[in-house]
Amino acid sequence: MNSDDSITWGELLRVCAAELGSEQEARWLCEHASGLQRGDFDAARDEVVSERCGIALRAMIARRLAGEPLQYVMKSWAFRHLDVMVDNRVLIPRPETEVVVQAAIDLANEMLRKSKPKLRVADLGTGSGVIGLSLASELPRGSTEVWLTDLSADALEVARANLAGSGLINSDVRIVQGSWFAALPSELKNSFDLIVSNPPYIGVYDPSVEVSVRNYEPHLALFAGSDGLDAYREIIAQAGEWLVTDGWLVLEIGHQQGDSVRELLAQNKFEQIEIRQDLAGRDRIAIAKI
């Protein structure tokens, strides 16, 4: 993309679409560089692009053409009802995780309907915070205390930024650092009604991992031992110490891990074990009661 002092946003959009091979990506990046939302951007198509906006857009196009994920280039992404900040300190939120969140919300609402006055929920390995913040924002206000944990201090900086941007800053959301349950105060054992996690679940030698994922996303959030099950082993083994009687565990799983995770849950005395599918019909969610 060459500099042109007289180029309009409409013309620049066409140039970017040709370079990227995607009109949708070009539009997102042009809107992001201009600082305009969709309707306002359409109204500004005949306006000349400022030098500052042109420089910013050229930098983003170069990063995208080098293979960097679009979400990191834009440093933002939509997840359910949230617009969140994302960068290479955290895993990119994916549509499959939205289905996991919905399963957790449905369970939480069912518990609230059964006259449970207030729920305590943990989002283990929160990353950008999208699971826990979605629960806090979509469940009735004041009904839920949500704990977000992560081993990575860098990831928690992103989660805190997303908490601040969510409008939930004065709500019952706690952000704590540590590995899985080690982040939580010991006095909270046997007090969580619901524990949710999207842990790393890719085997370190898995050849199917996309190049952009392996090159750009944090490996701590992706890989879990040779078979991808190490995080599940740890979480499932300890979850019973933290859940209340009849508490629920909800896990995002890899599409080929349903049987293995079911077996781990059964070995640790979980009941009502269910493996649910995502919108593509692949195993994606493990749900179980202690």
What is each stretch, according to the model?
Residues W28-L107:
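Conserved AdoMet
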Residues S226-A288:
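Conserved Class I SAM-dependent methyltransferase catalytic core
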Residues M1-V49:
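Non-catalytic accessory regions of SAM-dependent methyltransferases
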Residues G21, P140-R141, V244:
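Short conserved AdoMet
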Residues P200-A231:
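Mobile active-site "lid"/loop adjacent to the S-adenosyl-L-methionine
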Residues V99-S208:
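Conserved SAM/SAH cofactor-binding pocket of Class I
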Residues L29, G67, T97, I131, ...:
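Residue-level signal for inorganic ion chemistry
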Residues Q71, I202-Y205, Q256:
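Active-site beta-alpha loop architecture of Rossmann-like, nucleotide-cofactor-dependent enzymes
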